[in-house]
Amino acid sequence: MSYNQSRPDRSETQYRRTGRSTGNQQQQQQHRSSSAAGYGKGAGAPGSAPAPSTYPDNSSLSSNRSFKKPGNAQGGGQPRVNLPPVNHPNNHNNGPNAHSRSQVTGEPGVGGPTNPTESFNRNTGPIPKAPTSQSTVMSSKINETPNTAKVAASGDASQAFPLQFGSLGPDLMVPARTTSAPPNMDDQKRAQMQQSSLRTASNVPASVPKKDSSNKGADNQLMRKEGHNPSSEKADIQVPHIAPPSQTQKSPITNIRMPSVQTPYQHTQVPHPVHFGGPNMHMQTPVTATSFQMPMPMALSMGNTPQIPPQVFYQGHPPHPMHHQGMMHQAQGHGFATPMGAQIHPQLGHVGVGLSPQYPQQQGGKYGGARKTTPVKITHPDTHEELRLDRRGDPYSEGDSTALKPHSNPPPRSQPVSSFAPRPVNLVQPSYNSNTMIYPPVSVPLNNGPMSSAQAPRYHYPVIDGSQRVQLINQPAHTAPQLIRPAAPAHLSSDSTSSVKARNAQNVMSSALPVNAKVSVKPAGVSEKLGSPKDRSHGEVNISLSQKNVEACSLSSSQQPKPSFVSGVPNSSAPPAKSPVETVPLAKSSVETVPPVKSSVETAPVTTTEIRRAEMVSESISVEDQTCKVEPPHNLTENRGQTMPDSLVSDPETATVAAKENLSLPATNGFRKQLLKVSTTSDAPTSDSVDTSIDKSTEGSSHASSEISGSSPQEKDLKCDNRTASDKLDERSVISDAKHETLSGVLEKAQNEVDGATDVCPVSEKLAVTDDTSSDLPHSTHVLSSTVPLGHSETHKSAVETNTRRNTSTKGKKKIKEILQKADAAGTTSDLYMAYKGPEEKKESSNVVHDVSNQNLLPAIPQAVEAIVDTEPVKNEPEDWEDAADVSTPKLETADNSVNAKRGSSDEVSDNCINTEKKYSRDFLLKFADLCTALPEGFDVSPDIANALIVAYMGASHHEHDSYPTPGKVMDRQASGARLDRRPSNVAGDDRWTKNQGSLPAGYGGNVGFRPGQGGNSGVLRNPRMQGPIISRPMQPVGPMGGMGRNTPDLERWQRGSNFQQKGLFPSPHTPMQVMHKAERKYQVGTIADEEQAKQRQLKSILNKLTPQNFEKLFEQVKSVNIDNAVTLSGVISQIFDKALMEPTFCEMYADFCFHLSGALPDFNENGEKITFKRLLLNKCQEEFERGEKEEEEASRVAEEGQVEQTEEEREEKRLQVRRRMLGNIRLIGELYKKRMLTEKIMHACIQKLLGYNQDPHEENIEALCKLMSTIGVMIDHNKAKFQMDGYFEKMKMLSCKQELSSRVRFMLINAIDLRKNKWQERMKVEGPKKIEEVHRDAAQERQTQANRLSRGPSMNSSGRRGHMEFSSPRGGGGMLSPPAAQMGSYHGPPQGRGFSNQDIRFDDRPSYEPRMVPMPQRSVCEEPITLGPQGGLGQGMSIRRPAVASNTYQSDATQAGGGDSRRPAGGLNGFGSHRPASPVTHGRSSPQERGTAYVHREFASLSRASDLSPEVSSARQVLQGPSATVNSPRENALSEEQLENLSLSAIKEYYSARDENEIGMCMKDMNSPAYHPTMISLWVTDSFERKDKERDLLAKLLVNLVKSADNALNEVQLVKGFESVLKTLEDAVNDAPKAAEFLGRIFGKSVTEKVVTLTEIGRLIQEGGEEPGSLIEFGLGGDVLGSVLEMIKTEAGEETLVEIRRSSGLRIENFKPHAPNRSKILEKFT
């Protein structure tokens, strides 16, 4: 058959079965085969698509079928593919469709013979598409035997076998082109095996179609006839490419059947994006099943849900990325309730398209999974202690320091994603597409053991802050966690003699270090000949010291405060009377050393790096100190009854640094500088050499040290304590037991304010040389014990920061990771800004130890020298870690003379020691305020101690608030990455994203340790900090990642401390006040020697602050300046001119300022010439005027020779500046003339210069002329100057017609001409700046005006609005057809019906904006030119004043027909308020000032024009004003027009409230302006249009009573004149108040009824009213007014009175009727 053959010729008969389907499998096969055919077709010709069907067979409709609509996204438009014809031979045995054939066709021989003739006759119908339901009615033609089919296949192609649809599936359809390839039996078997599980036997046989190889276009009609198909379920198969339905071209490429492969829907194996439809497609209605012609895995929650097992999704599978815009989940488009439970099905049932992908691609985030690392074990050969190198320092880690760290940015793993909520979390789908969704895992409980690395470790631990004890935990990384109580007090000894580079693997820490701990600080170098090494005891602490910055001085033990502390714990190891010292040789160091000096808590300064390295405390015995150990006594350990599991050691790297620094010291006379090491061992056995040296001294500690140091005066100052060491030890032991909690809390709170770099060493320890009695020990120095507080010792920082590890960089810089760790440990409100810069270098730690005195000093040392501990610490370590960089170094360092010990005599050194004895750190002493209540005598208390104390206590309360002790649980807390969490992307610190600030209780669900890969939450902390132990349990994710609740502790941490000193970007609390660094040459405000220049500066500063509000105050300041000469006066005038020219808006204010100055400043006489302010002002005006002309010529002149040629842009800019300055000057001149500061002659001269005698003046001059005329025209336009003014305006009129001028200039000329015609009443009068209260008031008026105008919209066009809303909203009823956009399926989700929680916000909350007809003012054609400019709204009233006579911005609503709209507040007349603030507003209405100002000045101008046009008005004016009255008579009154207007408005408002007519009469007398009465009446009547009927009735009664009053406050002429003014502006008033004509007629009717005005006069006013005479009648307004008058008379007086008044007036109603098409309904009642 031909391709272009007509459709009837290519079609075949279609039989339709109306029964319901018997199974889903057949339909799935049909869809599968049709899709496969379409795939082969669409691959070659994607644009081919059939035309819509024109043969809908409605007789076969079923109840469960829905009509197919074009573009249906659910199946109507999507499956429009080119299907092969049913008689194609390939369909019998192609791929998996062989099963469909056997299923549908039935057994051979069942049916009867075929009728070829009938088949030929039925060939006129179109070949239908594949049926989607099975039929229960069988045709007689379906019983075709295979033999008959073969015979038919070999016959003519036109005799196609008739098919009955409903029994055949798309598997039997033949493609457009036939092929001779034999069927592939392997494909059939394979497909049969694949689909055997989903296939059910068919009970209905079907006929075998006859082959027709020539029917190539039959597949184009497969889908046209079927208009509606039942919905079906399809198995998960590979979705082919679907051709868009909008393309109709048929592809000539042969369709090739492709085998359908069952593929899970969730996997990303879709070769092509799924097309749900093209343009103008409609979604299926949700009440019926849909027709799917495309193999899409859909699970419709309806009655025909198939029995197909759902896909199972495992939580641990990798993410499945897929295109989520085009995917549809089950039951989409159906507005059924969504079963959102605690555990949501993985497929997220009933969620629309585009909301969220079913299994979106997860970001490469971190789930807290720990990295498996193989620790390198290093075992010491002597102690066999294991040393691990794979741990990281954590300042807050009290658990295992060798916790496994995850890799940076690992790829997504297939292991189960451990979530972190203690209970299931209800996931609520947001209104937008979230790009991350993690579904709940299986409920398989985890074991109670430690978490393996395959799972995400959770860190549910509280932040260990100030008052909470730090527990000693010593456990391997992979053992079960257990609680380790705080250990017993241990003997803490320090030894820095080792240079072994090793790291301690297991750090332990106690929340309260041993009370009676012994800290021994020994010299870094020990002479080999002074003793042999001894084993160290079990509980010593090694503290490394550096010779750098060490200067030793002797100090008696009695000179120190009694309590001494180690790490915030009372140091109970007081020295005995004799403190023998054991000499310990140096191990692994070549430094020449001195014997160790024994002291209870003596320390020496070390560098920042060394101290921080020394903070590392380990349970294993230090490797580097095995050769030199001191055997301590065990009595201190027995006080607590407990011993620490292992000894506490220091970082060996510190000793190496110390050794290296000692090697670098210069030699002096063969001797090296000697490093002292302070030891706290009290009863350690000593060597003989030490005893020998001690024998030469006295045995009493106080006496000995006093004798050696020679500092007995200072000994008395500090109240020495001569008790024995044992007593002190016992006492301090008791103190420690009693106040363990207190000291632990207080000192650990204070530890954050102490810098780790100052832990061991004070600032200056000086090597004091005193006597020559011990000269037999030239190479050794003996130091007697002294009880020096060691609050800043090395272990102090270790009490809270156990695992802090720092670099040994000589530059003193911190690595960024160490800074971040410090940020985590510093507290909750650390400054983010400080996280980007390292702390400052410690000034004290960088000092280099210099040679002592001279070269002959060391060999001559005869006595033991005691190491003085200067209690001034190097630096405070505040709780906020970044504040270490902000603590001022000069504030904490010692006196300058303490450094002078590097050279000089021994007396100088002793003096320095004396000066440093009292140099205690203020912050250091405040830490022990609870115990050390008394300061030493002579202690210099600085004022900032109190501030530091307050900060310390606030920090303590902060820690108490944030601490969550949970005894009995393992606190294996990791270092927090809170600082890094605020930065959205930082690869360098990715491992900190998985660390948590604390644990999470149930209810917060916890997004602990999860980072959604290089993104996340920026600006807030991710992890709420709360308590909770680590418990292995099923963990849940938190819904959308990266968010934080409002009232979480994270926000509290940022908000806490907001009252502290601000630093950087964020507040940093708990920081001492930073000392200001004073510059050598500080900035000072420059002083002026010249007195005249000082005056000018003072005057300029005053003028800069000049505003209308502070005018009087600043004027007094100017008068206070001594202006006593012409130079000063000229300077004042020049500055006033400069300000006025640059700010033309304030010209009136500056002119007023000059007017006041002229009267206040005296005259001067210089050189016999009288100098006045006016004279200088006039000269300045002339100078500026001429200067403008010169500058304009220079700007327009081409550059001469020798001058730099200016570009056109530069010349234009200069021209603009000159023009702006000239305009300001002209305006100022005019304002000065208005103040009578200049003469009229000068004004005429200026006008003549601006007009020029030539015919073409510059546009700038014309603009200046128009500005000057608008300013002073009303004053110079009088009878004497009439001839001159006429000449000016004749020339201006001529210039306005010249086309050479710009349109802007021509309009300005026209406006000036109109202004003179209107008697100089400006439409937009500019009178200078407003006060701030006026600006606020006008802004409120404008807002109210706009709101009132918008509020009239619904009443005027509500019906159209409702129709629009019904059409555009999906909420319309069933009969309302929504627009195509509402039904079309899109990638944003299908339209949903009205149901619970599935409302589409895209249509409901959208504001409806529609065009609204705004009536335009009707203007008659007149001679006057049209003036363009802002006529109201926001164009006026914001920065200028606009006084007017009457307003026509009537704010009436269309709903006022029934008595007015009482809900709308009254609008204002203009932008001016009342001068009587006590006047109330009636009925809660707003003042008239709140009305719009659209046509205020137009009305005023119209009123003035009408005055000239009406002879009656002119005669009335002459009667009122007399023959000598002129136009300027109102200006001659005592009150200005603006004041009269304000008084009249305030009076009428007060009358509405109080209803006191006498008050109105008194106000009119106070006004004393009878000529203003018509204007006042016009204002009152116009204002009443915005008020209620009751107030209008009161106004009508008031007008009648005023006319009838005895004092004749008003007369009939004034009343008529006022009514005439209202009628002149009635056309504009109706625009804002549609019923203004009716309201005015009622007032007129009241006046006629009371016989104040006759009806004849009212009729005349109506006929002559309007902008043009007769315009009111022409537009129908006159008829409305007259009809309202007659209606009012009828209501008030009755029908008889109305007839009598009409007869007597002689008015003809026909004369007031408007011409067609206008009409007056009110007037028609009386015709």
Swiss-Prot record:
The keyword Phosphoprotein applies. Residues 222-236, 379-395, 714-736, 979-994, 1188-1200 have a biased composition (Basic and acidic residues). GO terms for molecular function: mRNA binding; translation initiation factor activity. Residues 1202-1211 have a biased composition (Acidic residues). SMART domains: MA3, MIF4G. It comes from the Eukaryota. Residues 1539-1663 form the MI domain. Disruption phenotype: Displays resistance to potyvirus (C1YVV) infection. The modification Phosphoserine is found at residues 985, 1529. Component of the protein complex eIF4F, which is involved in the recognition of the mRNA cap, ATP-dependent unwinding of 5'-terminal secondary structure and recruitment of mRNA to the ribosome. Plays a role in the accumulation of some potyvirus during viral infection. Required for the accumulation of cucumber mosaic virus 3a protein and turnip crinkle virus p28 replication protein during viral infection. These proteins are necessary for cell-to-cell movement of the virus. Belongs to the eukaryotic initiation factor 4G family. This is Eukaryotic translation initiation factor 4G.
